[in-house]
A protein has these predicted regions:
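Conserved DHp (HisKA) dimerization/phosphotransfer helix of two-component histidine kinases, i.e.
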Residues: 47-101
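Conserved ATP-binding N-box helix of the HATPase_c
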Residues: 14-34, 39-41, 114-143, 188-198
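Glycine-rich nucleotide-binding loop
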Residues: 208-215
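Glycine-rich ATP-binding loops of the HATPase_c
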Residues: 200-207
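Short hinge/gating elements
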Residues: 73-76, 105-109, 172-179
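Glycine-rich/acidic phosphate-handling loop/turn and adjacent ATP-lid/helix
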Residues: 147-187, 217
Length: 219
């Protein structure tokens, strides 16, 4: 990544913090609305709706927080190597709903924490490729390292669904273009590109027939 394509760490932290707050605002607001309904309403059906709203919103908020903790945080309790089953569980809780489905294939049981962060960050970016929902096919392979060498990671995320598209600006961010266009929408793509660069990996995004493919592979 070239010098003029590197965002200052303070700006990166501010943008990621803003995105996390923005993403959680909907769920927290819904929980608050449900609590207000419980305080104000005596109708049994309304109270049942309020409890259901609180429960569903709390689950969604927890899934978002758990995803953000591993993707953007230190997650020190997990150690340097993370069980891939845990990463998959975190990803599924965050992504899957009535409109989105995840299909997972991997040749390893554990991944380095930085690779787990990259995987989750790229998954978050890939959501923008299917605004109407669809299927996300995750293919992960890791070449076991020789002594004193790091594991070599290759990751493919294939996005298949109606109105599939390469998210505007993402390819430029992956290519290391000027950071002036980076905002809350593109900050995760930039974060993924920074992680990839530090790990001697490269990111790409493009069309594969009617599908959209995101690729992470060694330089």
């Amino acid at each position: 990544m070239t010098a003029n394509a590197i965002l200052e760490d303070t700006a990166l932290a501010a943008l990621i913090s803003s995105k996390i707050c923005h993403d959680l605002a909907g769920q927290i607001g819904a929980i608050n609305n449900g609590l207000e309904l419980l305080e104000e309403e005596n109708d049994e059906d309304t109270r049942y709706y309020a409890l259901e709203l609180i429960q569903n919103s709390a689950k969604a908020a927890w899934a978002q927080l758990d995803f953000n903790r591993l993707a953007f945080g230190v997650a020190s309790s997990l150690g340097a190597v993370v069980p891939l089953a845990h990463v998959e569980q975190v990803a599924r809780r965050y992504i899957e709903n009535g409109k989105r489905r995840v299909h997972w294939q991997a040749n390893v049981q554990d991944v380095e924490k930085e690779h787990a962060k990259l995987l989750l960050a790229l998954l978050a970016v890939s959501l923008m490729a299917l605004p109407a929902g669809g299927d996300f096919y995750v293919g992960l392979s890791v070449t076991k390292p020789k002594e004193r060498s790091k594991a070599r990671l290759k990751l493919i995320i294939l996005c298949r669904g109606r109105s599939a598209r390469v998210p505007e600006g993402v390819a430029d961010v992956f290519a290391g273009k000027d950071t002036r266009a980076i905002d809350g929408r593109l900050v995760v793509a930039y974060y993924a590109a920074r992680l990839a660069s530090e790990a001697s990996l490269k990111l790409s995004a493009g069309k594969e027939g009617e599908d959209i493919m995101f690729t992470l592979e060694p330089l």
